[in-house]
Structures are given as structure tokens and as C-alpha cells.
Amino acid sequence: MTCGLVRIRLARFGRKNSPVYNIVVANSRKARDAKPIEVLGTYVPVPSPVTKRELKRGVVPIKDVKLDFDRTKYWIGVGAQPSETVTKLLRKAGILNDAWATSKNSNVNRKVVFERMETLE
């Protein structure tokens, strides 16, 4: 899979030990926190705290993700390549299907293909 010039990736903001990420469209050659082309949403990986009473009731702490679906679909349609972490988020959001290839998956698939070719020979 070739990497395009435009990527959808995470840009870190927030304080020390309290990360907040912006989901941004940026030039792949720019620094992580450089000015992006467009901000698509936010991702807070630390779950919001719940009280003991809520824990007893079975309330599960959740991670906050806010995303502009229309703009994200537009950028993917134009050819922007999401990073691996953003790909996972977009799969959970239902924007990408499970067949979407990442560089990590394609390397694993190549190894499996080569192993099968060796066993067939």
C-alpha cells in the first residue's frame, strides 16, 4: 500500500498525562502538531471517571470520540490515507469496513501468502 501525500492522523494536545488528540487531515511530510489542512474531530483516550455508585449500577467508563462523518468520508473518497490508529477508530465508527487494508495487515497477509506458497512447493 502506498502512502499518499495527505494523511488522516492524530495530533496530540492537552496536558502531561492527560492527552487529547485532534483527528486531522495533514500533509504526510509535516510534523505531528503542525497546522493541519482540516480538523475532523477529537479523541480523548482516557475514559471519563465514574462514581462508585455508577460502577455498582454497571456503568462503564467510555472514551470520548467526536467526528465529522461527512468530511471524513469526503477526505477518504478523495484519497487521504488514515493512519493505523485512525483506521481502528473509523472502523469502530462504521466509516471503514473490515476489509480496509492497513500497512500492518498487508505485511501479515504477505507473510501468510509466502508461507502457503512454500508449503505448496
UniProtKB/Swiss-Prot annotation:
SUPFAM superfamilies: Ribosomal protein S16. Belongs to the bacterial ribosomal protein bS16 family. The keyword tRNA processing does not apply. This is Small ribosomal subunit protein bS16m. It comes from Saccharomyces cerevisiae (strain ATCC 204508 / S288c) (Baker's yeast). PANTHER family: 30S RIBOSOMAL PROTEIN S16, SMALL RIBOSOMAL SUBUNIT PROTEIN BS16M. Gene3D superfamilies: 3.30.1320.10. GO terms for cellular component: mitochondrial inner membrane; mitochondrial small ribosomal subunit; mitochondrion. It is found in: Mitochondrion. InterPro entries: Ribosomal_bS16, Ribosomal_bS16_CS, Ribosomal_bS16_dom_sf. HAMAP family: Ribosomal_bS16. Its main location: mitochondrion. Component of the mitochondrial small ribosomal subunit (mt-SSU). Mature yeast 74S mitochondrial ribosomes consist of a small (37S) and a large (54S) subunit. The 37S small subunit contains a 15S ribosomal RNA (15S mt-rRNA) and 34 different proteins. The 54S large subunit contains a 21S rRNA (21S mt-rRNA) and 46 different proteins. Component of the mitochondrial ribosome (mitoribosome), a dedicated translation machinery responsible for the synthesis of mitochondrial genome-encoded proteins, including at least some of the essential transmembrane subunits of the mitochondrial respiratory chain. The mitoribosomes are attached to the mitochondrial inner membrane and translation products are cotranslationally integrated into the membrane. GO terms for biological process: mitochondrial translation.
